[in-house]
C-alpha cells in the first residue's frame, strides 16, 4: 500500500530536506524512524519520493512525502512523531494510488518568505511583483544554469504587512533552485530603491540580459503547501497536531528569551526595535 504524509519542520538545524551522507537532514531523520518502526526498510525499494527538496535552514508546513509500506497501520503521524526529533512533525496522512509521485504530480507549490524591517516601500514591491506573474524564463532567478528548462508559471504573489514583518506568498507550478529567495531579493532591491521595475523587466529576459543575484537568506523561507489536480483525502491527526503545537510553543518561548538575551549583548537602539 502507498501512503502519503504531510510533514512540517523547523529547518534551522538541518542541512536541507534531502538526505546526505554526513549531515543531518529531514529525510535522514525520517528514514531512520520509518525503518526503526518497521514501516519502511529501504527508501529506494519503498519508492520514497518527496514533493521537492528544501535547502539548508528552510522550513516547511506542507511538505509531502509518499512511500510504499506493508504496515500502513503504523504509518500514522502520532506513531511516527513519537520517534522523530522535536523539530519535525507528521500531521496528516492519506492512502494514495500506487503510482502517486508527490513531485511530478504536483499542480503547484506555495512558499512564504518573511522579512523584518520597515525600510521597504511596500507599494513599489507590490507593483513590481505584478511583472513576475505568468509564464517567464526565470534563468536569472536560479542558481543553476544550462539546458535545463527554466520557464515557470507564477500564479500568485501576495504581499502583506503586519507590524515590522512583511510576508511574501508566492505560488507557481514549480520552482527552480533558489528561485523564491532570488525573487524576494529582487523585490527587496526594488522596494529599497536600489533597483527599479525596468531592471526587473530586464531580469525576465535572460536572452538579452544576464545578472547574478544573491538569494535572500534561507531562514525566512517556508514551504507552505503543495496542491494536486485531484485533491488527496488527507486525514489530519488531531493528537499529533496538538502535540506539535505544544512543541512549537516551547520553541517560541525559547526564541523569545534568546531574543532578549541577544538584545543585551552589545546593545544598541536597533536591538530594542527588534523586540
UniProtKB/Swiss-Prot annotation:
UniProt entry keywords in alphabetical sequence: Isomerase, tRNA processing
EC annotation from Swiss-Prot or TrEMBL: 5.4.99.12
Family matches, as Pfam families: PseudoU_synth_1
GO molecular function, one term: RNA binding
InterPro entries xref list: PsdUridine_synth_cat_dom_sf, PsdUridine_synth_TruA, PsdUridine_synth_TruA_a/b_dom, PsdUridine_synth_TruA_C, TruA/RsuA/RluB/E/F_N
Active site: 55 (nucleophile)
GO BP field: tRNA pseudouridine synthesis
Positions with a binding annotation for substrate: 111
Signal peptide: none
Tagged with keyword Isomerase: yes
Similarity comment: Belongs to the tRNA pseudouridine synthase TruA family.
Name of the protein in its database record: tRNA pseudouridine synthase A
Species for this entry: Methanococcoides burtonii (strain DSM 6242 / NBRC 107633 / OCM 468 / ACE-M)
Gene responsible for this protein: truA
Amino acid at each position: 500500500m502507498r501512503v502519503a504524509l504531510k510533514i512540517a519542520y523547523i529547518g534551522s538545524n538541518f542541512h536541507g530536506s534531502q538526505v546526505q551522507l554526513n549531515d543531518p537532514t529531514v529525510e535522514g531523520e525520517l528514514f531512520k524512524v520509518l525503518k526503526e518502526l518497521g514501516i519502511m526498510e529501504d527508501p529506494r525499494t519503498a519508492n520514497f519520493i518527496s514533493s521537492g527538496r528544501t535547502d539548508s535552514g528552510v522550513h516547511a508546513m506542507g511538505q509531502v512525502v509518499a512511500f510504499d509500506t506493508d504496515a500502513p497501520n503504523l504509518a500514522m503521524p502520532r506513531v511516527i512523531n513519537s520517534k522523530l526529533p522535536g523539530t519535525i512533525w507528521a500531521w496528516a496522512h492519506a492512502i494514495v494510488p500506487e503510482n502517486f509521485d508527490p513531485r511530478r504530480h504536483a499542480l503547484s507549490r506555495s512558499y512564504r518568505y518573511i522579512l523584518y524591517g520597515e525600510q521597504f516601500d511596500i507599494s513599489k514591491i507590490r507593483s513590481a511583483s505584478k511583472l513576475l506573474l505568468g509564464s517567464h524564463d526565470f534563468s536569472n532567478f536560479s542558481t543553476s544554469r544550462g539546458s535545463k528548462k527554466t520557464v515557470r508559471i507564477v500564479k500568485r504573489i501576495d504581499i502583506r504587512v503586519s507590524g515590522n514583518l512583511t510576508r511574501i506568498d508566492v505560488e507557481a507550478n514549480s520552482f527552480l533552485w533558489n528561485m523564491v529567495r532570488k525573487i524576494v531579493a529582487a523585490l527587496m532591491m526594488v522596494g529599497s530603491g536600489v533597483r527599479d521595475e525596468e531592471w526587473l523587466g530586464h531580469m525576465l529576459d535572460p536572452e538579452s540580459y544576464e545578472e547574478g543575484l544573491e538569494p535572500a537568506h534561507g531562514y525566512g523561507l517556508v514551504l507552505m503547501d503543495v496542491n494536486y489536480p485531484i485533491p488527496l483525502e488527507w486525514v489530519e491527526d488531531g493528537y499529533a497536531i496538538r502535540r506539535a503545537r505544544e512543541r512549537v510553543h516551547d520553541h517560541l518561548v525559547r526564541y523569545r528569551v534568546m531574543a532578549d538575551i541577544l538584545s543585551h549583548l552589545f546593545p544598541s537602539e536597533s536591538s530594542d526595535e527588534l523586540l
